[in-house]
Design a protein with these regions (language model features):
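Bacterial N-terminal signal peptides
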Residues: 5-15
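Acidic/His-rich structured neighborhood in mature extracellular/periplasmic domains
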Residues: 21-57, 64-65, 96-218
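Positively charged n-region of N-terminal signal peptides that target proteins for export
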Residues: 1-2
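Mature N-terminal segment immediately following signal peptide/propeptide cleavage
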Residues: 63-101
Length: 218
């Protein structure tokens, strides 16, 4: 609902906003996204829905036989590279509403530690978490989306403060564990992955992937 509200509000944007300076529009967009988030979080979480209907019994707790230990180790390795301030920004309880805080639009006020504020070692560890968690195809798709976001910046008069490959944020919910529930989220323009882990079982939902443009020549 948060995402839908933002999409509808941007589609129905009044003409007087279009004429406003970019900085004023972005500030107004951010305020709209904050209000939409507050309204959405005020509603009780009901589960995964399709067309407004809760989909029951989607995922049963069962062993898959596929170890998630590489994912746990990669998450711990990332946390080890972060300083105390960064850890405080990126760590949340496993049942925190942070799971519901994501949006496609670039102007959304995000949580966690951004790739743009990481040093090279931290960034490598963050990509290491993605590599351990996703298939080779999924990792490539994620990196391609991030790189195409920089292309979008180039197409918008080099507006890299708004669009670039490092404007993506990672949060971790719960403590990376072999037995207890935990997970992570990456959130940014055209790339949102919610990754929940319980033992050797993984649930990735919701996920949003997109791109603008879709193809760019190097």
């Amino acid at each position: 609902k948060i995402l839908l509200s933002a999409i509808v509000s941007s589609i129905l944007l009044p003409s007087f906003l279009i004429a406003q300076p970019r900085s004023d529009r972005d500030a107004r967009f951010r305020q709209n996204s904050i209000r939409a988030e507050q309204n959405g979080l005020a509603e009780p979480f009901k589960g995964v829905t399709t067309n407004g209907e809760v989909q029951k019994d989607l995922f049963h707790i069962r062993s898959t036989g596929v170890s998630t230990e590489p994912v746990r180790k990669a998450a711990l390795a990332l946390l080890k590279t972060l300083n105390p301030e960064q850890q405080a920004k990126t760590k949340f309880p496993v049942d925190d509403p942070e799971w519901r805080k994501w949006m496609n639009q670039h102007f959304y006020v995000r949580q966690g530690v951004g790739f743009d504020e990481m040093n090279p070692t931290q960034r490598d560890a963050a990509f290491g978490l993605l590599k351990a968690s996703l298939s080779a195809k999924g990792l490539k798709l994620s990196k391609d989306i991030m790189n195409l976001n920089r292309t979008l910046g180039e197409l918008n008069n080099n507006d890299f403060p708004q669009y670039n490959e490092l404007l993506y944020w990672i949060t971790l919910m719960g403590e990376p564990s072999a037995t207890e529930p935990w997970g992570w989220q990456i959130d940014g323009h055209h790339l949102i992955i919610n990754y929940f882990v319980l033992g050797d079982q993984v649930v990735m939902s919701p996920v949003f992937v997109g791109s603008e443009p879709v193809i760019a020549e190097s």
